[in-house]
Amino acid sequence: NSPTTAQFQEKPFINWFEIGLPKDVSGYPLYQVNSQSEQKVRILHSPSNPLAKGTPIILSVIDKLKGKGYPIELVKIEGMPNSKVLEELAQCDFVVDQLYSDTPMATFAAEAAHFGKPAVVGGYFAHVMHSYIRKENIPPSLFVHPDEIEQAIEKLIVDVDYREELGRRAQTFVRTRWAPEAVATRFLRLITGDIPVDWWFDPQDIRYVHGGGIPEAHTR
């Protein structure tokens, strides 16, 4: 389970950040399109549930940044096969995942990472995650408080060096720490009972009560 939903638990559980989120994209070419020579910055947003992902706010923020004069090409895809999502990931500069995430890197951001494309991710967990996740288990993304989403998107638009470096770190993370073989090895340790003490999480330690898909005002 995750520390972000620990408020619903009573017994200690395995922190899933210790295990990882494997993604096998070996069936698709991991080619990359270098768009540095292109005039516009290509941003991809692919919400599975637009309301829960904060899509209306994300689109409003991007429109605001366009109004500032930034050359943005927004690609929004919904209800398309995964092969189409992967195709678009290869052609974008970065992705905007969602606004209310309980993890720095959910599935869409992890797929982007395989292509070396960084993700902007919003979530209330961003400011407290270091209290509940060991540093080596934190996947690289620009994970920010929902109120900071505009500044985060703007940073990846203007700071090309940072954007590319973050994409490289994300790619290294998913190809090593979250590689299917590495995650399977950790699952085998669970099955055999060879469980390190620091994999366990006590729900009594959690102070985070927000949760994915819900604005802070709705939890009060």
What are these regions (language model features)?
Residues 17-53, 59:
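Conserved donor-binding/catalytic core segment of Leloir-type glycosyltransferases
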Residues 118-125:
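Short hydrophobic beta-strand element within catalytic cores of glycosyltransferases
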